[in-house]
Amino acid sequence: MAKDLSNQIVDVCRFSYAGEGGFASATMEQWALEAMLYDPARMKQRFVLFEQICLPSLAAQTDQDFTLIALIADTMPYRWRRLKDLMAPYPFLQVCTLEAAGPLNSTRRAFRRGWDRHSKFITGFRIDDDAVACDYIAKTRAVADQLLKLGWADEDTPAAIAFHRGIYWNMNSQEKPYWEFSEIGPLGLASAMVTHNDSLANVYRWNHRKIAANVRTWCDPNDVMFVRTLHGVNDSNRSIPPLPS
């Protein structure tokens, strides 16, 4: 009997999720974290980036067989829960509401929420205020399926897929806002992880800079696969890579 290598692609986006740890604000008191995350000006920009950059790039995918889980906290003010209104024009989008929890626990539950209940494996990726290439899902699926066939990923062994090259968009620069750059290792953006559907691990398990030190990793530094935004409201300590000489 042929082995079951069925594989579902699921993205989890922590949408201003007031959880415990995982970002630069991890040391803040919960009330201060929520005040920062739900600041009206910050939330308005968050929605603009999500609606104008992230969602359109996913809607343009050549392979539409995927699920996007927007993870929000149960403390999010009601006015910002209009996020759920976006589920109608974007059928791949689901909203998952959870209490505050650590990054691995919360994202594991969010991935389970997006699971179709029959695929044996989940290829989970992450996206935030950014865009991925229109063929990102198709290419990620093709690589993931090959990794499963080769045994690089199985029930007990996860494997990562990382595309390193993309376009950086510095929203604070008018002179040279865009440039192409290839990272030396995996980013959180345009990286995915193939795991068993009941695995304790997922793409949030390790800092993206440490994924290749902990998981078998397939890398592609050649294809331009993302647009990464650089702005003032992201809380992931994003750094600006060197401009081309």
Q: PLM features: residue spans?
A:
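A conserved acidic beta->alpha catalytic loop
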Residues: 42, 72-80
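Short beta-strand/loop segment that forms part of the nucleotide-sugar
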Residues: 65-75, 97-99
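A solvent-exposed, charged loop/short amphipathic helix patch at secondary-structure junctions
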Residues: 17-45
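Short, acidic, metal-binding catalytic loop of nucleotide-sugar glycosyltransferases
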Residues: 35, 53-65, 89-90
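Hydrophobic targeting segments
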Residues: 8-13, 57-58, 66-71
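Conserved catalytic core of nucleotide-sugar-dependent glycosyltransferases
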Residues: 102-118, 132-217
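Short acidic donor-binding loop at the edge of a beta-strand
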Residues: 119-123
